[in-house]
Regions:
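Conserved alpha-helical scaffold segments that buttress catalytic/binding sites
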Residues: 1-28, 33-308
Length: 308
């Protein structure tokens, strides 16, 4: 009962015939190409290993679960190629495993890879929903480069192509960090969202989240949750490309993760994939951001273990 994450982890390779039954599986995406294309502050390539370092000494509370690590996919020059390779690793982990798969970023371009991983792992008819904790919609149109600002526009285009509904919710969006054009596109694409200001009202925020998400959760088979670390106040998450002046509370996100794990049976969806994006150790102070990322991952694992 005295084990910590670093004592529990098995390093595995994609493609081996591993039994990952009841495992939590980590997959890193070393990329800041999308951040660079988005004209942001680079450094998120070192994010996955910084998060691992912060996870290493956390206690392991789930005696029946194993921990696997599939290592990192690195984006050197070709972002789309690296996203496909990372998507293959996510797809492999989801197919080999019935536990939670966790993507470690890397810039938020990780999200396009994560989505493709779920899409490829599931039957064509599976309805996928995305919940993004983020100060930004990330619904920009690729022009022509894709970036850390385009992943959910890419998902929207993919849904149009496959004639499937676009189920996307963004929690913590900042009016001061998204243009009117992005708000217009969010509205025409039926993006569900709550602003950072709306989520800073502690007495009402969980009720608002329930009202926003429940209709979507009823309509999906698979849930993918992505946390962009710039959703949090700069004092708590300085190690990101675009620090937030306001941000939302980590406790709110943790409560929502537990809400999402709990409602799987109520609404009949599965939550199997979570990623954490925009970890940039170059700008971190006292590993604050890495420790926050690790705590959120710990809580996602705890939420799913408690409600499965």
């Amino acid at each position: 009962e005295g084990l910590r994450w670093h004592q529990k982890v098995n390093e595995l390779e994609v493609g081996e015939d591993n039994s990952l039954a009841n495992s939590v599986t980590l997959v890193g995406f070393e990329s800041d190409l999308g951040v660079a294309f988005n004209k942001g502050r680079v450094g998120a390539t070192a994010g996955p290993n910084a998060i691992r370092q912060a996870l290493a000494n956390l206690p392991w509370h789930w005696p029946n679960a194993a921990l696997a690590d599939l290592g990192n996919v690195t984006a050197k020059e070709n972002l789309a190629q690296a996203q496909t390779q990372y998507a293959d690793a996510i797809c492999y982990a989801l197919k080999q495993n019935d536990g939670l798969v966790i993507g470690l970023g890397g810039g938020h371009e990780i999200a396009w890879g994560s989505y493709q991983g779920v899409f490829n792992a599931k039957p064509e008819s599976a309805r996928i929903g995305i919940i993004n904790f983020d100060a930004h919609f990330d619904l920009r149109k690729p022009s022509p480069n894709t970036s850390s600002g385009t992943p959910f526009r890419q998902v929207y285009d993919h849904c149009q192509l496959h004639d499937t509904p676009f189920h996307y919710a963004c929690l913590g969006v900042s009016k001061a960090a998204n243009t009117p054009a992005l708000f217009n596109f969010a509205n025409t694409s039926n993006t569900r969202y709550l602003t950072d200001v709306a989520l800073n009202d502690e007495s009402l925020c969980m009720q608002r989240i329930d009202e926003l998400l429940s209709p979507m959760l009823k309509d999906i088979d698979e849930l993918y949750v992505t946390v962009c670390l710039d959703a949090f106040p700069a004092a708590q998450a300085p190690g990101v490309s675009a620090p937030s002046a306001l941000g939302i509370s980590p406790t709110l996100v943790i409560n929502t993760l537990h809400f999402l794990a709990q409602h799987q049976n109520t609404y009949g969806y599965q939550w199997r994939l979570c990623d954490v994006a925009e970890m940039n150790p170059n700008y971190d102070i006292d590993s604050r951001t890495a420790k926050l990322a690790a705590r959120l991952i710990f809580e996602a694992v705890d939420a799913i273990s408690s409600h499965t």
